[in-house]
Structure formats: C-alpha cells, structure tokens
C-alpha cells in the first residue's frame, strides 16, 4: 500500500487508475472470502482504507 505522501504527489489520472486497481483488488478479495479461500482477511481492511485515502486526495485536488 502506498503512503499518503506518495499519493499526494500523483496526478489526478494516476489517482483514478490507482482507485480502479484498488477496487478490482477489493472485489477479488471479497470473492475469495465468500468462497472461503482467503486466509488473510486483514487485506480487505487495508484495501478499503487505501480506497478511502485515494478518494480523500481526489477530493482535495478537486477543491483546489
């Protein structure tokens, strides 16, 4: 997962691509959990928080 400073230095397009990638990861993790093949359930929380970070930075950049 990327640090907040790394995310702030990214452009809006890069952030949107990062968000799309995180959403795909989140979906895949949820499907694995539903099928019972996910051992590391903490990854779901990590990805969810990363999505929130990216969305927050996108909102900050939109306000400027």
Swiss-Prot record:
Keyword entries, A-Z: Ribonucleoprotein, Ribosomal protein
GO biological process terms held by the UniProt record: translation
Residues annotated as signal peptide: none
SUPFAM superfamilies in the cross-refs: Ribosomal protein L29 (L29p)
Annotated GO MF terms: structural constituent of ribosome
Entry keyword Ribonucleoprotein: yes
GO cellular component: cytosolic large ribosomal subunit
InterPro entries per the UniProt record, alphabetical: Ribosomal_protein_uL29, Ribosomal_uL29, Ribosomal_uL29_sf
Homology family: Belongs to the universal ribosomal protein uL29 family.
PANTHER family for the chain: 60S RIBOSOMAL PROTEIN L35/50S RIBOSOMAL PROTEIN L29, LARGE RIBOSOMAL SUBUNIT PROTEIN UL29C
Record protein name field: Large ribosomal subunit protein uL29
Species of provenance: Legionella pneumophila subsp. pneumophila (strain Philadelphia 1 / ATCC 33152 / DSM 7513)
Gene, per the UniProt record: rpmC
